[in-house]
């Protein structure tokens, strides 16, 4: 492994004590897991309680009534989803973000990241609520690999060189450049990070198949296609472009041919207006 990459992983900030305790309890309890103990662990951390209630009442989950207690959150989302979203939110809060090595405006990039989570929640909320809830943590961290590789490039002093090569190639070969400079591309790195933080294996495998969802096992193929569609639509350089909007529909059709049930009418209805407009235009 690239020494700088290894250093980046080793230097990742530790997870908060409460998050680690919850993760260890859920992962070790199996069928003996008790909801009351999950609630007791979370209740030790007032900041975590506040953040969970904020997330539960956000548009990500779309509950029809105000959620006011941790017991309600755990009951509504389930223990596994709670563990994963707590992990994702804790990780997301730990990093300074500067994606200038990619030639991207950081504020625009962060807005796009937020839109990804909003979309996957809105798209799947009525069609497959369980899937929507399961994938929110993945969507929250979808661009984390890019964020950390950007930090690594800045730290190593190679950010300007990387950016110049990226510009020379018109930002068309980002993954190849990432492999050249960092020894890994940002999507593969995200899978490595999910494994490092011990996310559920279903989420690790879903992330691992974002770019080849057809190769995913049947058990997580719908997860992989949903993430692949979101990744395509909100591709950081050209989010919602004519090409990416049409490619997302091609992915839905591919999923259908693979025996995965997505409602095309619902997908088209939930597309952002920019994507709907761009479906009528020629590709970039």
Language model features with spans:
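Terminal helices and disordered tails flanking the catalytic cores of nucleotide-processing hydrolases
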Residues: 1-4, 254-284
């Amino acid at each position: 492994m690239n020494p700088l990459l290894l250093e980046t992983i080793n230097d990742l900030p530790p997870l908060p004590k409460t998050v680690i305790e919850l993760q260890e309890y859920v992962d070790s309890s199996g069928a003996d897991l008790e909801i009351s103990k999950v609630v007791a662990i979370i209740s030790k951390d007032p900041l975590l309680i506040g953040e969970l209630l904020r997330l539960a009442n956000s548009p990500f989950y779309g509950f029809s009534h105000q959620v006011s207690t941790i017991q309600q959150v755990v009951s509504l989302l389930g223990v596994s989803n709670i563990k994963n979203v707590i992990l994702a939110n804790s990780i997301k809060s730990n990093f300074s973000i500067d994606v200038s090595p990619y030639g991207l405006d950081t504020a625009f990039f962060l807005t796009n990241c937020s839109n990804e989570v909003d979309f996957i929640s809105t798209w799947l909320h009525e069609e497959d609520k369980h899937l929507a809830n399961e994938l929110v943590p993945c969507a929250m961290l979808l661009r984390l690999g890019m964020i950390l590789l950007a930090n690594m490039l800045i730290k190593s002093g190679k950010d300007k060189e990387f950016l110049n090569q990226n510009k020379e190639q018109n930002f068309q070969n980002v993954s190849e450049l990432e492999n050249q400079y960092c020894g890994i591309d940002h999507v593969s790195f995200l899978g490595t990070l999910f494994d490092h933080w011990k996310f559920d294996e279903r989420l690790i495998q879903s992330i691992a198949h974002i770019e080849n969802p057809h190769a995913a096992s049947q058990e997580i193929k719908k997860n992989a296609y949903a993430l692949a569609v979101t990744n395509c639509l909100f591709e950081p350089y050209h989010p919602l472009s004519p090409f990416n909007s049409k490619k997302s529909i091609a992915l839905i059709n591919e999923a259908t041919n693979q025996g995965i049930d997505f409602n095309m009418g619902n997908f088209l209805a939930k597309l952002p207006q920019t994507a709907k407009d761009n479906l009528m235009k020629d590709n970039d």
